[in-house]
């Protein structure tokens, strides 16, 4: 995995990884620029990406993922494809980006109208909306924080509040942008409340990367990760709604307080060890990289909830 120099949510990425897969992360060199379109261009330069990918070569990854949303949408669809080609040339393995993974996930869901949440400024948020328009996706509503730094410090409550604000009109799904925004524990609650698939930058990145390995991302109550039904059945958009409200049956859903979620525990500042992004490969017995246990063993939510949604395992 190649990630920006300020990426601080390594722990969150691991939560989607099954225990037989190894994840390795490297970062792009530090750039003294606030989060902006200029920074997005700097951290997505092909030379920088190539160096990051080559830094991962010794671990023999089977897929390379560039974990940065703004860095992969700033050049438009053409620029995103060029980034993938540059990384593939450097590492000689399949490569993908967060924005490309988002488009892939929306196609998988059959979603063409989305609500959008970002921590960015208005100009960066608009650039993402323009990218989506180019690939045929309409943004029905949006909410953004206007941040230029320390995005990983945003609490889950703020993410949930923005999601509620953004979902107006008839959206097929909600997308929470930025790989530095914590989302893993918020997704199940938002899907139950909003009755639609909820996608996040880290989620779609890991889903798409693991998919190329023939593996499944770990994440209970996340619509994108539902197993495919028999051919001919509806897309996940309907499946997610039915999971909480079966056809012909209406019931009240009580979402547990977002305060019940564990605090965000970022990895903190990490010294750059190379260009942006993560590498993923099946774990071998000799691997020194620890693996993440599946998130299927979970504790129940507080009794105040009428749903059987699981509470994520506490951080170690």
Task: Say what each PLM segment does.
Residues 53-95:
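Glycine/small-residue-rich loop that forms an oxyanion/phosphate-binding "nest" at active or ligand-binding sites
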């Amino acid at each position: 995995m190649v990630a920006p120099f300020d990426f601080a949510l390594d722990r969150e990425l691991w939560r989607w990884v099954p225990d037989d897969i190894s994840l390795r992360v490297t970062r792009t060199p530090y750039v003294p620029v606030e989060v902006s379109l200029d920074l997005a261009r700097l951290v997505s330069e092909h030379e920088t990406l190539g160096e990051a990918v080559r830094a991962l070569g010794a671990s023999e990854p089977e897929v390379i993922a560039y974990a940065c949303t703004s860095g992969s949408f700033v050049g438009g669809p053409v620029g995103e494809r060029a980034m993938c080609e540059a990384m593939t040339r450097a590492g000689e393995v399949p490569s993908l980006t967060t924005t490309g993974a988002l488009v892939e996930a929306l196609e998988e869901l059959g979603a063409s109208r989305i609500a959008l949440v970002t921590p960015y400024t208005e100009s960066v948020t608009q650039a993402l909306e323009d990218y989506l328009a180019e690939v045929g996706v309409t943004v029905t509503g949006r909410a953004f924080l206007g941040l230029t730094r320390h995005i990983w410090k945003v609490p889950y409550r703020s993410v949930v509040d923005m999601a509620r604000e953004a979902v107006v009109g008839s959206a097929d799904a909600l997308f929470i942008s930025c790989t530095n925004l914590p989302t893993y524990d918020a997704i199940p609650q938002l899907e139950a409340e909003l009755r639609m698939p909820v996608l996040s930058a880290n989620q779609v990145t890991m889903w798409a990367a693991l998919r190329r390995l023939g593996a499944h991302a770990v994440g209970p109550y996340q619509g994108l990760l539902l197993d495919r039904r028999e051919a001919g059945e509806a897309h996940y958009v309907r499946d997610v709604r039915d999971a909480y409200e079966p056809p012909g049956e209406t019931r009240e859903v009580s979402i547990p307080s977002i305060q019940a979620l564990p605090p965000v525990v970022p990895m903190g500042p990490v010294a750059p060890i190379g260009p942006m992004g993560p590498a993923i490969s099946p774990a071998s017995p000799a691997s020194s990289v620890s693996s993440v246990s599946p998130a299927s063993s979970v504790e129940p939510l507080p009794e105040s909830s009428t749903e059987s949604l699981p509470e994520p395992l506490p951080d170690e």
